[in-house]
A protein has these predicted regions:
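Single conserved hydrophobic/aromatic residue that forms the stacking wall/gate
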Residues: 1-7, 11
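Short N-terminal binding/cap micro-motifs at the start of the first secondary-structure element
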Residues: 12-19, 41-44, 190
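Histidine-anchored nucleotide/phosphate-binding helix
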Residues: 15-29, 52-60, 167
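A structural motif
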Residues: 29, 63, 94-95
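A short beta-strand-loop structural module common to alpha/beta enzyme folds
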Residues: 31-41
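Glycine/small-residue-rich interface belts in oligomeric ring/scaffold proteins
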Residues: 42-66, 75-84
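Active-site cores that bind ATP or allylic diphosphates and position pyrophosphate for catalysis
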Residues: 69-388
C-alpha cells in the first residue's frame, strides 16, 4: 500500500513532529509520498528555505517521493489548499491512504464534522452570512454557526480545519483514498513552547532567527542539508510596497482571495506603510484573518490572479525521490491523469499554474540570507533531489 501525508510545514521542511507522523504512516503503508508547499506557505510567508533543500530533508526523514503543491493551492484558503493536494493524489492514481496531522487525533470525529460541513443546510448558511455581515471573520462565523453540532476546537484549531477540508475534498471527488489522522504530537501549529524534542514550525523559525540551536528538534543536522536558512520575507518589503502603489483597485480585484472591497483598504494602507509587516497591521480588521491578508498581499506581488486557480492541477512536479519513489513513479506514469514533471525543460505545455510557480520561486529567492545566492529561474534550472 502507498500512503501519503500532507507536508505544509516549512521548517527546512521537517521537524520531529513530522518524523513521528511519517513513522506512524509506515506502520500501515509500504511507501510514503509527501505533497509539500513550494516557495510560499499557507499562513502567508516565504518558506524557511528553498524547496529542494526542504525536499532533501523530507527524504532524509523517511519520505519516498516529494511532490510540490503548486503555489495556487499552497497560498490559498484551507478548502482550496486541501482540494489541490487531494486532486494531485487522485490524479497520481497509486495512493491508497492519506494521513494528516490533527489536534483531534480522531478520524471519526473529523469525518463526522466534514460530512456536516459538506451538507450544509440553508439555516446554517443564513447564520454564517449574518455573522460575517456583522464583522466576524469567516472561520469564527463558521464555528459559531455550527456550535451546537461540531465541537468548537474542530473548527478553530488549524490542523483540524485542514483535516476536515481534506476529507471534504475526498468526498467531493468521490475518491477511493482512505483518510487517516495522527494526533499532533504535543506542539501545536503556532505553539511557541518547547515540549521535550517536539517544537512547532512557528517556534523553530523563531529559534532560527535568534541563532538558537534547533538540531535537537529536527531529525537531521542542518549542516548535512547544506541549505541557506532562514529565508526572510522582510527582504521583500520595498518590492511589496512598490508593487501595490503601482496597482489600481481594478488590478487588485482580480487577485486571489480579494473580495468585498478589501482592495481599497490594501491600496490606501500601502501608501502609509513602509514594510510588509506594517502593511499587514494597517490592513487588519475583524473580518479577515491575518493569514488571509498576508496571502492576498503576496498573491498581488507574484501576480496570482483568480483565473489561475482551478480545482484540478495542470501537472504534478517531482521535487525529490528515492529508489522506492522511483518504483511508485514508474507505476504512476502509466495511469496518471496529468503530466508528471521531472525535468522542467521537457515541460512544453502552456500552464498558467506552472508560470505562477516560476514567478513565486523567482521572488522567494530574493529572501535568501546570502545575497549572491538570490538567483532567478531556479525552477527552470534545478532537477529533483535523488537520494540513493
Amino acid at each position: 500500500e502507498i500512503g501519503s501525508c500532507d507536508w505544509s510545514s516549512d521548517v527546512c521542511s521537517s521537524d520531529l513532529g513530522h518524523k513521528y507522523q511519517i513513522d506512524e504512516i509506515k506502520k500501515h503503508s509500504d511507501a510514503v509520498i509527501a505533497v509539500m508547499s513550494g516557495s510560499f506557505v499557507q499562513r502567508g510567508d516565504v518558506a524557511i528555505t528553498d524547496k529542494w533543500s526542504r525536499a532533501k530533508t523530507a527524504l532524509s526523514s523517511g519520505v519516498d517521493l516529494v511532490i510540490e503543491l503548486p503555489v495556487c493551492y499552497a497560498l490559498n484558503a484551507a478548502p482550496n489548499f486541501a482540494t489541490g493536494g487531494i486532486n494531485i493524489l487522485n490524479a497520481l492514481g497509486v495512493v491508497n491512504n492519506i494521513c494528516f496531522g490533527s489536534e483531534s487525533g480522531s478520524i471519526d470525529e473529523l469525518m463526522s464534522a466534514a460530512e456536516l460541513l459538506e451538507n450544509e443546510n440553508s439555516e446554517i448558511s443564513e447564520k454564517i452570512k449574518k455573522y460575517v455581515m456583522g464583522g466576524m471573520s469567516y472561520p469564527n462565523a463558521l464555528t459559531k454557526a455550527y456550535s451546537a453540532l461540531i465541537p468548537s476546537d474542530i473548527l478553530s484549531e488549524p490542523n483540524n480545519i485542514l483535516a476536515t477540508e481534506y476529507i471534504r475534498a475526498l468526498i467531493r471527488s468521490d475518491s477511493k483514498i482512505k483518510p487517516m489522522t495522527v494526533k499532533r504530537h504535543k506542539a501545536g501549529y503556532h505553539d511557541r513552547n518547547l515540549y521535550q524534542n517536539i517544537a512547532s514550525a512557528t517556534k523553530l523559525r523563531e529559534m532560527n532567527r535568534n541563532n538558537e540551536n534547533i538540531n535537537d528538534f529536527i531529525p537531521y543536522k542542518l549542516e548535512d542539508i547544506n541549505c541557506d536558512i532562514p529565508y526572510d520575507i522582510s527582504n521583500l518589503d520595498s518590492a511589496i510596497i512598490s508593487k501595490l502603489r503601482l496597482m489600481t483597485a481594478e488590478d487588485l480585484q482580480n487577485i486571489s482571495e480579494v473580495t468585498e472591497g478589501i482592495e481599497n483598504r490594501i491600496l490606501s494602507s500601502a501608501n502609509m506603510s513602509y514594510s510588509f509587516e506594517t502593511l499587514v497591521e494597517n490592513v487588519k480588521n475583524k473580518r479577515y484573518t491575518t493569514s488571509k491578508i498576508r496571502r492576498m498581499i503576496i498573491s498581488a506581488l507574484i501576480g496570482f490572479t483568480k483565473d489561475i486557480y482551478s480545482p484540478m492541477p495542470q501537472y504534478i512536479r517531482i521535487l525529490g525521490i528515492n529508489k522506492v519513489g522511483m518504483t511508485i513513479l514508474k507505476q504512476a506514469k502509466g495511469i496518471c491523469k496529468v503530466p508528471i514533471i521531472t525535468k522542467t525543460a521537457d515541460f512544453k505545455e502552456q500552464s498558467p499554474q506552472f508560470n505562477l510557480d516560476v514567478r513565486a520561486t523567482n521572488i522567494a529567492m530574493l529572501c535568501n540570507p546570502i545575497p549572491t545566492h538570490r538567483i532567478g529561474n531556479a525552477d527552470l534550472k534545478k532537477s529533483p533531489i535523488i537520494m540513493k
